[in-house]
A protein has these predicted regions:
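Active-site-facing alpha/beta catalytic cores
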Residues: 2-6, 86-241, 245, 268-269, ...
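Internal helix-turn-beta structural module
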Residues: 304-351
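Gly-rich Lys/Arg/Thr-decorated short loops/hinges at beta-loop-alpha junctions or inter-strand turns
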Residues: 19-27, 223-235, 318
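Conserved phosphate/anionic-ligand binding catalytic regions in large, soluble enzymes, centered on
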Residues: 55-68, 326
């Protein structure tokens, strides 16, 4: 008798509810559909340069408490409306966390924060949160880590990110080529911008790859390519949000034949992983924009109701509205940062008007 050679390290396999089942239970509303489509079109226009507003992806590092996430969304929806003439605000709603080694992998993977890994529950919670956010009139952005999760929630996502650890991955470039929304690729963890530029170029082309259907069957996906992709500067061995770094990144994009459209992440290596440094990063970015910088089309900010972060400890209640992954700035600091960016966009418009008048004189 032949020895078993397969699944030797698989302890258990459970059935996963199909995307079709979850989407039927939590259908997308007409309001959510309008919000998603309007935001996607706005972001596309910002990327093409026909909309001079700034795209701002702002919200918690990760969602662990759906109630607090919707509370945050209600506040952000009002701010989005007030600053809509200068900023296209999209809430950061991240459910999956790539880990350098090990740790909590996000609401979808372990929604109860206890190692029970009730992924079927996590998928429903994620879809419910996205539905609630969109129904407030607030578009949502998230990071995708695999080829399966998008089938459950991508119809409620206006913008997606591919993280620094996965930008160089062929699978993720293929995924981006088939997503219906604009996608941002972060530079590598070491600061390498070339891999992000290559990813944007790769994702713009058609691909064929193995995937999963809404009915849960294995399939072959054939994509058209995604022309609405861009890079995200998130720092590496050193920060890369300054003017010299923007110039360097733009030169790399030009060499790769990719549009010089750049988003800057105020967190991660650009803040030295210290959330209290995010405001000074935003201030520097705002200064560049105020001076007429056109290549910066977006900014990311990690923000929550309460500043800082906390650990999940058995028997200890969590602080409401505070991150359990990376530290964030609090709500008041967020409002100040977004007002600063909105003022910068207004100043950039003045610079452009002045240049136009000078050329016309």
């Amino acid at each position: 008798m032949l020895s078993t050679t397969d699944d030797l390290r698989i302890q258990e396999i459970k059935e996963l509810n199909t995307p079709e089942e979850v989407m039927r239970e939590i259908p997308r509303t007409l309001t959510a559909t309008r919000v998603v489509m309007t935001a996607r079109n706005a972001i596309k226009s910002i990327l093409s340069g026909t909309d001079d507003r700034l795209l701002v992806i702002v919200g918690p590092c990760s969602v662990h408490d759906p109630v607090a996430a919707v509370d945050y969304a209600e506040r952000l929806a009002g701010l989005r409306e007030r600053l809509a003439d200068r900023l296209e605000i999209v809430m950061r709603v991240y459910f999956e966390k790539p880990r350098t080694t090990v740790g909590w992998k996000g609401l979808i993977n372990d929604p109860d924060l206890d190692g029970s890994f009730n992924i079927n529950k996590g998928l429903r919670l994620a879809r419910n949160v996205l539905s609630a956010v969109n129904n407030l009139g607030l578009p949502a952005g998230t990071e995708f880590l695999d080829l399966t999760t998008p089938q459950y929630i991508a119809d409620l996502v206006a913008w997606a990110a591919i993280g620094a650890r996965t930008t160089e991955s062929q699978i993720h470039r293929e995924l981006a080529s088939g997503l219906s929304c604009p996608v941002g690729f972060k530079n590598g963890t070491d600061g390498n911008v070339r891999i992000a530029a290559d990813a944007v170029k790769s994702a713009s082309h058609p691909h064929h790859f193995m995937a999963v259907t809404k009915g849960g069957r294995s399939a072959i996906a054939a994509t058209t390519g995604n022309a609405d992709c861009h890079i995200i500067l998130r720092g590496g061995s050193r920060p890369n949000y300054d003017r010299a770094s923007v110039d360097s990144a733009a030169a790399e994009l030009a060499r790769s034949g990719v549009a010089q459209r750049i988003m800057i992440d105020a967190s991660h290596a650009n803040s030295g992983k210290k959330p209290e440094n995010q405001p000074q990063v935003v201030t520097d970015i705002a200064r560049q924009i105020s001076g007429g910088e056109q290549r910066i089309m977006g900014v990311m900010v990690e923000s929550n109701l309460v500043a800082g972060r906390q650990d999940v400890l058995p028997g200890t209640a969590l602080t409401y509205g505070q991150s359990i992954t990376d530290g964030c700035v609090d709500w008041d600091t967020t409002v100040q940062a977004l007002n600063r960016l909105a003022d910068a966009v207004a100043a950039r418009r003045e610079v452009q008007c002045r240049k136009f008048r000078e050329r016309s004189a």
